[in-house]
């Protein structure tokens, strides 16, 4: 009886431990603030810096962050391409964070608005070798993907003009994910966010949002999903947080599973997440047979990212949080975990995510992105208050670019506990068998009768 109780208790503990797949919601004490600023400060020469402070500091804001294999944090600062007098004084559209200042990368000359190659960067990616993939918006309305070596030399240029829209900067390339196993890049084109509706005297959303597919080997490009429901904002979605309202924006976030089999994408204003097999995207002839699955997510979001552990991270606009879920295991997103929670940033929202693959930290950028979007980039920042933040939190995870390791979400301590409990269970089962054996009635050896004894004696004689 005692052994049975012990075994039952061990099984109960074992069952509860293996259910602990992800830590509870993180508190603010778990989060390290690594950057805070009222306005962006650039590490440039004195003359250029003074011109920037005079003309552009109220308009420059960070959009995307990434971390290379050496732990260097890169930040994009888009030039809005609506006022050359403002844009040309923003020193760098792609920068590294150094001593709480932004240093144009690879140098100031390459970022020069008139003479440099890099005009305006919204989204970009860094591969495991440290190469940078920059979605460049040229001031002449052309679009291209610039690939740079870690030392700042240009490695390759991909012309995207065949699949982008050039009239009045109608293509806004916001995010890119890389499949370097099969040499493909997937890019979200939000389309021109605003379009004047002169009949009603207001600004309305454009419907040119699309997904671009680029073959990195032969440089062929495909544009698809234009005017499809999965690429358009959900106008019926209720706004749950009035302080963090957002315009009706199309495709923005995109994620690639670590096994490179699935693309996940979503318009900004949508609680739907769309999933499509990458095999359908790699050949224009198979696009008509594409099978798009619809999942759910908890909030409108700017950026999403999958990880090497098979987890799905995304920014939540209404909840002002970074959420994480087992995207392949719980397709309804019913058990979302919050990596950061609490509405203590007023009208700031999390907009970008980045992993440090060496340390296992998740970095996320918080800014007033919604102010620029909601006011058609006509409102200046209030530089008397903090506007930009970058935080990091330990998640023991890495980017989707690393090989999949989907079972590593179970902590080492849990694995040790599982092994110990398994040994205890084995020992308990062994003790139970021994106990049952001892309690079993033994057969008594029957003594020979007189006739048998006489027969035995005769045989012996």
Task: Give residue spans per PLM region.
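Beta-rich, blade/repeat-based domains predominating
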Residues: 55-69, 112-131, 163-188, 192-193, ...
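Beta-propeller blade signature
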Residues: 89-100, 143-152, 204-219, 379-398
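Residue position within the beta-strands of beta-propeller blades
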Residues: 74-76, 134-135, 186-188, 265, ...
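Residue-level signature of beta-propeller blades and closely related beta-rich strand-turn architectures
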Residues: 79-81, 138, 190-191, 269, ...
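Beta-strand-rich domains and repeat architectures in extracellular enzymes and scaffolds
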Residues: 30-92
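Surface-exposed loop and turn segments in beta-propeller and other repeat-based domains
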Residues: 34-55, 100-116, 155-168, 220-245, ...
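Blade-level signature of beta-propeller repeat domains, shared across WD40, Kelch, NHL, RCC1
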Residues: 350-415
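Cytosolic C-terminal tails of single-pass type I membrane
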Residues: 442-461
